[in-house]
Amino acid sequence: MTIHRILKGFAPLAALAGAALLAGCDGMNIKIGDSEGVPLAELDMSGPAPTELVLAGPDRVIVTEGDELDITVSGDDGAIEALRFSLDDDSLGISRESDSWRDRGVATVRVTMPSLTAMVLAGSGDIEAASMSDEADVTIAGSGTAKVVRMDARSLDLTIAGSGDFEAAGSVGELDMTIAGSGRARMADLQVGNAEISVAGSGDAEFSSDGAVEANIMGSGTITVNGRADCTVSAMGSGKLNCREVRAADTGPEAPRAPDGPEAPEAPEA
């Protein structure tokens, strides 16, 4: 496995989010794209609806489908006051104002948009999306959790850098997955056509496939593939690729037919 397979995973975070995270004593200063964001009341949502989402912070975002962009917030007052929003090209950015990551509680942001094709999660927050489509792209950098209830995409490019978790169900034609660290991809209910997997560290992943699966594992990570996939692996360390053939449940032999009961004797003649 070449190192560029791991480094490429950080490209969506840089290109899509344009985020600079600078650690400080009192928290973190976040800038998404060319803007540090504005309160929700000041966000101009008159343009085209975004198709990409960036969350930088400890808050929770719930994404549902709808004809137009709509955003509502709830939760702890301090967290709500600290939220900052930005719209940059096709991306909606959600973060907090400088030095307000700690001791403010947690906010829940509900976003309605026509389509979600890419998301980036930086930090310890959570994203739950009803669906993703087309050429889906997911990047998790940190300890956050992202979930897609229904995936129906031609391809999925998934990167987990850190200890974050990803969960998905549905189907994708092609899966390109990179895990760098101890992250987990829990996708047992995701049917994949073909897959190319790279793991560096102790990360784990599970998905289903009947196609070609190629894995490169450096470390102690474990990849589990359910189905009838054609699997190949190159490993350095104790990492494993487990391809488990899953067939339809065996109905077993038919139960034996109960024997016929004895016939009743004829009645004697009078």
Q: What is each model feature region?
A:
Residues 2-12, 21-122, 126-139, 150-159, ...:
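Acidic (Asp/Glu) and glycine-rich low-complexity loops/linkers
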